[in-house]
Swiss-Prot record:
GTP 1 binds at residues 10-17, 57-61, 119-122. One of its GO terms (molecular function) is ribosome binding. This is GTPase Der. Estimated to be present at 7000 copies per cell. Residues 352-436 form the KH-like domain. GO terms for biological process: ribosome biogenesis. Pfam families: KH_dom-like (PF14714), MMR_HSR1 (PF01926). Residues 4-167, 176-351 form the EngA-type G domain. It comes from Bacillus subtilis (strain 168). Belongs to the TRAFAC class TrmE-Era-EngA-EngB-Septin-like GTPase superfamily. EngA (Der) GTPase family. InterPro entries: G_ENGA (IPR031166), GTP-bd (IPR006073), GTPase_Der (IPR016484), KH_dom-like (IPR032859), KH_dom-like_a/b (IPR015946), P-loop_NTPase (IPR027417), Small_GTP-bd (IPR005225). Gene3D superfamilies: 3.30.300.20, P-loop containing nucleotide triphosphate hydrolases.
Length: 436
């Protein structure tokens, strides 16, 4: 199943971003920045009581020049659409306001669990008026202080209680789950329709749903597939659903539930920052990735156009140097037939295990070719390596001192492993560990 999604909702200036940073900040600070990946602080991974979950700060959703109450309304509705649990945050020093009651009215309509957090209660004396917040109708209010981190444990305990009740859609291990992501109007739905119209594709049914995310199940060459959240690709109409961050949010949920991610670019419009942002999430989540350039039929081209476009992609997506690039047209169906084989290959490589003895031969040959680096008179010594997991393939290299493993040498080892075993379409991870 995908990770549960928790949204923090409330009127401006109640401390949503402070709480977001409190819950997610420690996690964010230990994640190494990936070159070329643009981070968006609206959305972050977090962990509590052995639950991994995704956290949304709806205050980071820019609705534009909408009137004040309309902004609050739209942010709350985004949370109701996308979250599994909602943290409704109010300012304990100001008491219940008309704007709080406005948010409460919107949240009454949701069937999602709502946990009420009363922020800015920095000491015991300030908590005397907490009972006023029962009037909002969401049960026990949890007193917290974002500034000092007080009360967050109790709040997160209450949130985590609801995780066990979240419905999930389970598929067999053999089923390949993938999604098509990209900004609005790049042609994701058209690509799906073109794919499902191929001769060898048998669409069997619409699979079970997780909330409103309808998945499409089909068989291709006797292999079962699920396209995650085909409903999300087609969902249009409301004002906020056309905002960049809403579409990013929807894409992140689909990425989370997929093994392979097809990043769809617009051949006519080229690459924009949002493309990099969404692709960066797929990479950081360790998913297999295929890059699809759609609308290639509409591009004026000569014999060098495709090569130049590919070089431009490699330049913008340096962190996806392992991902194959496919050029196609959903409209004319030209080269549509290349997509499914690329997804299958990426999935196979995402799950690929290599023999330990062969891996160590590759590592030792690499060291012989390019001796290990030294630092302050100490030389890195590599003893042996082993693959510890798949999805994505992950390797531990046992060394004398992990601090001596410079990222450039780690990158060199990754390239040698790729040369030996392929791994096209999937990231691989390498960790240096001290031999005990």
């Amino acid at each position: 199943m995908g990770k549960p999604v928790v949204a923090i909702v409330g009127r401006p200036n109640v401390g949503k971003s402070t709480i977001f940073n409190r819950i997610a900040g420690e996690r964010i600070s230990i994640v190494e920045d990936t070159p070329g990946v643009t981070r968006d602080r609206i959305y972050s991974s977090a962990e509590w009581l052995n639950y991994d979950f995704n956290l949304i700060d709806t205050g980071g959703i820019d609705i534009g020049d909408e009137p004040f109450l309309a902004q609050i309304r739209q942010q709350a509705e985004i949370a109701m659409d996308e979250a599994d649990v909602i943290i409704f945050m109010v300012n304990g020093r100001e008491g219940v306001t008309a704007a709080d009651e406005e948010v409460a009215k919107i949240l009454y309509r949701t069937k999602k669990p709502v946990v009420l957090a009363v922020n800015k209660l920095d000491n015991t004396e300030m908590r005397a008026n907490i009972y006023d917040f029962y009037s909002l109708g969401f049960g026990e209010p949890y007193p917290i202080s974002g500034t000092h981190g007080l009360g967050l444990g109790d709040l997160l305990d209450a949130v985590a209680e609801h995780f066990k009740n979240i419905p999930e859609t389970k598929y067999n291990e053999e089923v390949i789950q993938f999604c098509l992501i990209g900004r609005p109007n790049v042609g994701k739905s058209s690509l799906v329709n073109a794919m499902l119209g191929e001769e060898r594709v048998i669409v069997s049914n619409v699979a079970g749903t997780t909330r409103d995310a309808v998945d499409t199940s089909f068989t291709y060459n006797q292999q079962e597939f699920v396209i995650v959240d085909t409903a999300g690709m087609r969902k249009k109409g409301k004002v906020y659903e056309t905002t960049e961050k809403y579409s990013v949010l929807r894409a992140l949920k689909a990425i989370d539930r997929s093994e392979v991610v097809a990043v769809v670019l617009d051949g006519e419009e080229g690459i924009i920052e949002q493309d990099k942002r969404i692709a960066g999430y797929a990479h950081e989540a360790g998913k297999a990735v295929v890059i699809v350039v759609n609308k290639w039929d509409a591009v004026d081209k000569d014999e060098s156009t495709m090569k130049e476009f590919e070089e431009n992609i490699r330049d913008h997506f340096q962190f996806l140097d392992y991902a194959p690039i496919l050029f196609m047209s959903a409209l004319t169906k030209k080269r549509i037939h290349t997509l499914m084989p690329a997804i299958i290959k990426a999935s196979e490589n995402h799950s690929l295990r290599v023999q330990t003895n062969v891996l160590n031969d590759v590592i030792m040959d690499a060291v012989a070719m390019n001796p290990t680096p030294t630092h302050n008179g100490s030389r890195l010594k590599i003893y042996y390596a082993t693959q510890v997991s798949v999805k994505p393939p992950s390797f531990v290299v046992f060394v004398n001192d992990p601090e001596l493993m410079h990222f450039s040498y780690e990158r060199f080892l990754e390239n040698r492993i790729r040369d030996a075993f392929g791994f096209e379409g999937t990231p691989i991870k390498i960790f240096a560990r001290a031999r005990k």
